[in-house]
């Protein structure tokens, strides 16, 4: 199964152009699944729907995994077997009839304007680290970008003259305007760095 997994990971990286975080999630999920199969003496191309159900039960009851983790695991295993079926490495996808568990939708905790102001005042720009942290917080607040998106930015992704940033997420790219505070904090960090 190791050889097949390597080919699948290459497909995800090269053809699907998934983000590094997504790729790492697939690797983690499928490594754990592969170890389970080895432990049970089951060949990957002989896995049945019942084997999948027992594995998911193992994750839930013995390992205490949350429904969201189990749902992601199902998606990883399903994608791997879809790839294998498409490439005629196995005859059928044992996850075809497997349903993902219901996931409770949690409403995000929204900060008040006062809390946001307090947060943005936290980094003291007395050194480069403080200037960087202030720029990142202003940037995150102004753009709504995730931390992983911000730290993967390159200097060429930011247009200081236009006041925009190009956010690349996998194969998608979007242009996001920067606010004045964010732009000023970013310029200060670039000048100090």
Set out the residue ranges of the language-model regions.
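Conserved catalytic core of the tyrosine transesterase superfamily
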Residues: 1-193
């Amino acid at each position: 199964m190791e050889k097949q997994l390597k080919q699948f990971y290459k497909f995800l990286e090269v053809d699907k152009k998934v983000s590094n975080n997504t790729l790492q999630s697939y690797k983690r999920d499928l490594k754990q699944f592969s170890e389970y199969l080895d432990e049970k003496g089951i060949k990957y191309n002989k896995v049945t729907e019942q084997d999948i159900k027992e594995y998911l039960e193992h994750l839930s009851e013995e390992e205490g995994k949350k429904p969201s983790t189990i749902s992601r695991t199902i998606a990883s295993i399903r994608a791997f077997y879809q790839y294998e079926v498409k490439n005629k490495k196995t005859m059928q996808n044992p996850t075809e009839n497997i349903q993902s568990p219901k996931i409770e939708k949690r409403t995000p905790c929204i900060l008040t304007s006062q809390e946001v102001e307090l947060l943005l005042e936290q980094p003291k720009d007395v050194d480069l680290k403080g200037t960087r942290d202030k720029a990142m917080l202003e940037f995150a607040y102004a753009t709504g970008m995730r931390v992983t998106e911000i730290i993967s930015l390159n200097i060429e992704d930011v247009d200081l003259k236009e006041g925009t940033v190009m956010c690349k997420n996998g194969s998608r790219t979007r242009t996001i305007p920067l606010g004045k505070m964010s732009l000023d904090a970013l310029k200060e960090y670039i000048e100090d760095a």
